[in-house]
């Protein structure tokens, strides 16, 4: 059976299966038939600013309407807004067409079910099973209809602001806002300006091709430069669909999801709002675990993907979880990552404590970490080669205390990720070069290297 779903929905290159109009039509028909069986006849669809998103939405709508399911099309909105409206309108399903932090060549789709939570892996497998069959479409007497609601922005703006105290203001606080030329490009500036902030706006002019292009949470150079040149108090960078956020302190240092989770957890504990502990993933920096341990906050890691964080939070009845990449779940407000709400909560802590983002991060010391991406490769089996395994087996001896290595297939891109972490950045650099050389000797590969800390 062909597997279509990754860690966050379906994703791929536009024009190649599964990111084609034909596939999205079939996907719409498959989902529609399943929903119709359960007497679900209406869903909500939003999208990001990619050129291909409109075409894919039209194809999906056609498949859905053909089997009797009606669609509320809300246009360009952040992913967490679709989660919010799925719950607000008491709908069974919400859909977002987006490839999140990927560039315009990619696109994808993700789903929410009742109460705005991500679709379960079990339901994804059910959809995949049907997609692997030949679809027979009978003539439906009642076709679904499509309605367009483009005036929902203010409702979501009001919701985001409602997560703050009534008298909260950001007067004269200078913020560089990077909207990644994506789904937050209209909403985010309105929200921060309405709160009184002095907003320096970047990457808020989408043209369908520039989403996440030298901007957004995976490319921070420009926002870091602007924070310094504008003498801003901090920077806030969203990804293309607004469910991730990375922040920049006034010295130009990035503050990722692990550090944001630490700031929130420490504040929650101080204010007696913390229920139990917090949840991260297997990619969470070891420095987070050490810092949380020092202040007595339990920490559990789960598989990559914010839905696994949500599942563990519900199981433990905890409230906070995050991925290093900037997906931060605050269950008091939303069941998914919401970049705007997360950044607002951090700003509230800064003002409550009369502090700075830099100071709030001062007692979490991130371990040096490098991520090696082996590009255009989804066959992880070659890493079992004895030469590669010989190098990997020596990492503990070479890197020392607190060191670890993780190898995994990316759930959002066509690549293999290798994370190397330890106490000494020099040793990690040396070891990563050794590993790249031996991998290349076994199989010629293209690499990208990200130095995290």
From Swiss-Prot:
One biological process term in Gene Ontology: carbohydrate metabolic process
Catalytic residues, chain numbering: 100 (phosphoserine intermediate)
EC number: 5.4.2.10
Cofactor or coenzyme needed: Mg(2+)
GO cellular component, one term: cytosol
Catalyzed chemical reaction(s): alpha-D-glucosamine 1-phosphate = D-glucosamine 6-phosphate
Class of enzymatic activity (EC top level): isomerase
InterPro entries reported in the protein's UniProt record: A-D-PHexomutase_a/b/a-I, A-D-PHexomutase_a/b/a-I/II/III, A-D-PHexomutase_a/b/a-II, A-D-PHexomutase_a/b/a-III, A-D-PHexomutase_C_sf, Alpha-D-phosphohexomutase_SF, GlmM_bact, Phosphoglucosamine_mutase
PTM remark: Activated by phosphorylation.
Family that this chain belongs to: Belongs to the phosphohexose mutase family.
Protein name: Phosphoglucosamine mutase
């Amino acid at each position: 059976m062909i597997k279509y779903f990754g860690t966050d929905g379906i994703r791929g290159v536009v024009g190649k299966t599964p990111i084609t109009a034909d596939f999205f039509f079939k996907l719409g028909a498959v989902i529609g038939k399943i929903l119709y069986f359960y007497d679900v006849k209406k869903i909500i669809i939003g999208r990001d600013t990619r050129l291909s998103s409109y075409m894919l939405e039209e194809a999906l709508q056609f498949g859905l309407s053909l089997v009797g399911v009606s669609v509320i099309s809300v246009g360009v909105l952040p992913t967490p807004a679709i989660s919010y409206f799925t719950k607000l309108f008491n709908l069974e399903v919400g859909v977002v067409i987006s490839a999140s932090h990927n560039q315009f060549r990619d696109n994808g789709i993700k789903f929410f079910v009742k109460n705005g939570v991500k679709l379960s892996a079990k339901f994804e497998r059910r959809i995949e099973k049907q997609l692997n069959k030949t679809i027979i479409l009978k003539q439906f007497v009642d076709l679904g209809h499509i309605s367009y609601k483009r005036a929902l922005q203010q409702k979501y703006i009001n919701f985001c602001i409602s997560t703050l105290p009534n008298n909260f203001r950001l007067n004269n606080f200078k913020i560089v806002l990077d909207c990644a030329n994506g789904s937050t490009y209209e909403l985010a500036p309105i929200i921060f300006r309405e709160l009184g902030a002095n907003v320096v706006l970047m990457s808020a002019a989408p043209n369908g091709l520039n989403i996440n292009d030298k901007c957004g949470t995976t490319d921070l150079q420009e926002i870091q430069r602007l924070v310094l040149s504008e003498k801003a108090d901090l920077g806030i960078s969203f990804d293309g669909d607004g469910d991730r956020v990375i922040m920049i302190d006034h010295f130009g240092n990035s503050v990722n999801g692990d550090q944001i989770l630490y700031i929130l957890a420490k504040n929650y504990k101080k204010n007696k709002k913390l229920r139990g502990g917090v949840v991260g993933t297997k990619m969470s920096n070891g420095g987070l675990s050490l810092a949380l341990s020092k202040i007595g906050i339990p920490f559990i890691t789960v598989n990559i993907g914010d839905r696994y964080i949500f599942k563990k939070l519900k199981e433990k009845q905890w409230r906070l979880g995050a991925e290093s990449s900037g997906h931060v779940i605050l269950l008091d407000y939303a069941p998914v990552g919401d970049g705007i709400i997360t950044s607002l909560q951090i700003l509230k802590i800064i003002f409550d404590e009369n502090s700075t983002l830099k100071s709030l991060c001062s007692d979490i010391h991130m371990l040096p970490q490098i991520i090696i991406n082996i590009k255009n490769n989804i066959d992880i089996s070659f890493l079992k080669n004895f030469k590669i395994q010989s190098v990997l087996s020596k990492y503990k001896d070479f890197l020392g205390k607190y060191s670890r290595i993780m190898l995994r297939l990316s759930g959002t891109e066509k690549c293999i990720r290798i994370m190397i972490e330890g106490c000494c950045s020099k040793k990690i650099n040396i070891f990563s070069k050794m590993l790249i050389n031996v991998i290349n000797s076994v199989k010629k590969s293209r690499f990208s290297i990200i130095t995290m800390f």
